[in-house]
């Protein structure tokens, strides 16, 4: 969506224009400056202002001259015009020709003619022989690039008097960066707020240098929702990350470096060499052992729902593979499946994985991401803590094998109290939320405020809770060095990276 800012001469008494409207309206250059002033941006002399009443309106209304309806192709199908009147008040005009939408953000009486006229125009236009119908606009595809080029050419010819900017994603924009118009086009920061439907614009070339906060009647999120699937918003800085490249960036925010949640499949792809992954116990599913009663949704239905949503059978994936050529056994929990909660199936799969690693003398990695024990399975889920810990004891103490625990955000509850903290080496991701009880539970139980950041990985690291904080982009190399340090080497020495 393109945004235009005009220092328009609009008042409550009459609509006025910055230049003579008797000029040709073949382009947006109709809104221009023909005075020859050295500074067209701040030139507000009376000789350049013509009242609507000075224009012959026998054929067209005032609105015709303001928007150049005879050549409506000068507007693309989705434009927002940001306008300031000479009293200093600001408002926006939103025009969407394709969807027949015309809105003004302030219900001012002197704008009623404008809104009612254009609404009528959009609703009643027809392919008749009238001066309102623009055949070029409706009969052919007027491309974005052609629109940008024609606008810039028009602006250069008429030395347009625009206060700030045109902001677009056109590739052709850079081709004009050294031209005359570049002095009137500047980079602006438009901060969208999906909650309030408002945006803030800083006009760096404004005469008073002030900020204008303009609230529209429409919601920007609704207007741009067809583009939302292209972006992922950071939970920390709220910056946008292009979804197509986000996976290759290991779900790390490009703006602030925050580590967002990853699916278990993505983590396996990150850690395991291509073509070496061999999953275990994929057909193991829960059968609602205690027939948990729920008024909202039966436990079985909820399991089925998450299976369809994630493509997984349970909240953990286990299997064997190679990490830089080193054979390993690995289990990866997935928070997207019922919050990574540990039920009987999760406990059984991890226990079998540890036993397989014990029998095969393989190094073991478990990536934790869990809210704790699964309440829908009652004491059976709590029993998994002891069950996994028992298998881990045999693996570590009796067989003297090497177990690395990786704590990601969040790792809480029964997972923290059992195998999450039993690793020979415990690694945490940056800014990971690691705790036994959550902040809300502690505050409600003890009636005390939990200090901000006291359950973050960095705070726990300084208290000695685990061994290292390793970013995702370095994790595979760190693990490879740890395994080799403990006597686990690649099957093929050429696999070392």
Swiss-Prot record:
PROSITE patterns per record: COA_CT_NTER
Co-factor binding details: Binds 1 zinc ion per subunit.
Zinc finger (C4-type): 234-256
Major location (coarse): plastid
This protein's pathway: Lipid metabolism; malonyl-CoA biosynthesis; malonyl-CoA from acetyl-CoA: step 1/1
UniProt keyword list: ATP-binding, Chloroplast, Fatty acid biosynthesis, Fatty acid metabolism, Lipid biosynthesis, Lipid metabolism, Metal-binding, Nucleotide-binding, Plastid, Transferase, Zinc, Zinc-finger
Binding residues for Zn(2+): 234, 237, 253, 256
Localisation per UniProt entry: Plastid, Chloroplast stroma
Keyword flag Iron-sulfur: no
Disulfide bond residue pairs: none
Entry coiled-coil feature ranges: none
EC numbers on record: 2.1.3.15
GO biological process, one term: fatty acid biosynthetic process
GO MF, one annotated term: zinc ion binding
Catalytic activity: N(6)-carboxybiotinyl-L-lysyl-[protein] + acetyl-CoA = N(6)-biotinyl-L-lysyl-[protein] + malonyl-CoA
HAMAP family for this protein: AcetylCoA_CT_beta
Protein role: Component of the acetyl coenzyme A carboxylase (ACC) complex. Biotin carboxylase (BC) catalyzes the carboxylation of biotin on its carrier protein (BCCP) and then the CO(2) group is transferred by the transcarboxylase to acetyl-CoA to form malonyl-CoA.
Protein name, UniProt field: Acetyl-coenzyme A carboxylase carboxyl transferase subunit beta, chloroplastic
The species this protein was found in: Platanus occidentalis
Taxonomic placement: Eukaryota, Viridiplantae, Streptophyta, Embryophyta, Tracheophyta
Gene: accD
């Amino acid at each position: 969506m393109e945004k235009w800012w005009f220092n328009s001469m609009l008042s409550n008494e009459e609509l006025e224009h910055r230049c003579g409207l008797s000029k040709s309206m073949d382009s947006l250059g109709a809104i221009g400056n023909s005075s020859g002033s050295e500074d067209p941006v701040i030139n507000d002399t009376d000789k350049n202002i013509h009242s609507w009443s000075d224009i012959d309106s026998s054929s067209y209304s005032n609105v015709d001259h303001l928007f150049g309806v005879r050549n409506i192709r000068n507007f693309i199908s989705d434009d927002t015009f940001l306008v300031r009147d000479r009293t200093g008040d600001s408002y926006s005009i939103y025009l969407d020709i394709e969807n027949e939408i015309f809105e003004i953000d302030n219900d001012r009486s002197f704008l009623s003619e404008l809104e009612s006229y254009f609404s009528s125009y959009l609703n009643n236009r027809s392919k008749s022989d009238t001066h309102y119908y623009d055949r070029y606009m409706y009969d052919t595809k007027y491309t974005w690039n052609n629109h940008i080029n024609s606008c810039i050419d028009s602006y250069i010819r008429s030395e347009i008097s625009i206060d700030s900017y045109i902001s677009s994603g056109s590739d052709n924009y850079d081709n004009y960066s050294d031209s005359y118009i570049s002095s009137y086009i500047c980079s602006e920061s438009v901060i969208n707020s999906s909650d309030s439907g408002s945006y803030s614009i800083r006009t760096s070339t404004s005469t008073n240098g002030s900020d204008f906060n303009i609230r529209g009647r429409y919601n920007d999120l609704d207007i741009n929702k067809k583009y939302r699937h292209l972006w992922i918003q950071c939970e920390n800085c709220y910056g946008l990350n292009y979804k197509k490249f986000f996976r290759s960036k290991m779900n790390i925010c490009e703006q602030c470096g925050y580590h967002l949640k990853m699916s278990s499949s993505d983590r396996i792809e990150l850690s395991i060499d291509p073509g070496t992954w061999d999953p275990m116990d994929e057909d193991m599913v829960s059968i609602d052992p205690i027939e948990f009663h729920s008024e909202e949704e039966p436990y079985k239905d909820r399991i089925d729902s998450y299976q369809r949503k994630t493509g997984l059978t349970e909240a953990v994936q286990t299997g064997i593979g190679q990490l830089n050529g080193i054979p390993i056994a690995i289990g990866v929990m997935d928070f997207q499946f019922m919050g990574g909660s540990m039920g009987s199936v999760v406990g059984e799969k991890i226990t079998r994985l540890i036993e397989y690693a014990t029998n095969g003398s393989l190094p073991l990695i478990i990536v934790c991401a869990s809210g704790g024990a699964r309440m829908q399975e009652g004491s059976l889920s709590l029993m998994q803590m002891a069950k996994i810990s028992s298998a881990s004891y045999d693996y570590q103490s009796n067989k003297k094998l090497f177990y690395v625990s990786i704590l990601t955000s969040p790792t809480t509850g029964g997972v923290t109290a059992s195998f999450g903290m039993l690793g020979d080496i415990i690694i945490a991701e940056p800014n990971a939320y690691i705790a036994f009880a959550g902040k809300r539970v502690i505050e409600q139980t003890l009636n005390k405020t939990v200090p901000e950041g006291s359950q973050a990985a960095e705070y726990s690291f300084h208290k000695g809770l685990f061994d290292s904080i390793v970013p995702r982009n370095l994790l595979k190399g760190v693990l490879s060095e740890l395994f080799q340090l403990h006597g686990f080497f690649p099957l093929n020495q050429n696999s070392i990276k």
